[in-house]
């Protein structure tokens, strides 16, 4: 645990020196034999409680370096057998199975201030939408069941796991309950088109951001 914390502390110091204050890590996804290599060694293993503890240590290491961690990919990407950069990942596990495994690392660390959704479709909750675009998963599972009340950012909305155009994805992710919409590919036209009709940042999102900064500066 200390090795993990120290390793992420050193990563955080490097990022800080480069002027980067937020890191989209650590990964709290559980590793299965069938897990797609896109998760790979970013996962801390197959035991949900070990993943929980090591993920927490990684988050603390980044915090100690002055960098905000983002735990991902809530509510759990480990069961997916495809790469969500190119294909929509679908999870058919029951809620009972998910509660005994994939949900645990996120629920155990629900007090962390920042999380990123996975573009995973939980058929048992919402068979029609991936998490990023699903109010049923975001409000029903992430907010209510897991009790995560921090800042929620989407995974990259340019990824092919999602339907429709990028501007439509932005609208849908915010409507579903994401606080922030992430676009990583630098397509300026997409970005301009995406912000035309989006609502102003809500007071709740501002409160969550303020809480994130308070957490970073706390002992």
Residue spans for each PLM region:
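A broad, structure-centric signal for solvent-exposed, well-ordered loop/edge residues
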Residues: 35-37, 46, 51, 95, ...
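Second-shell residues forming the walls of enzyme active-site clefts
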Residues: 56-57, 62-63, 67-215
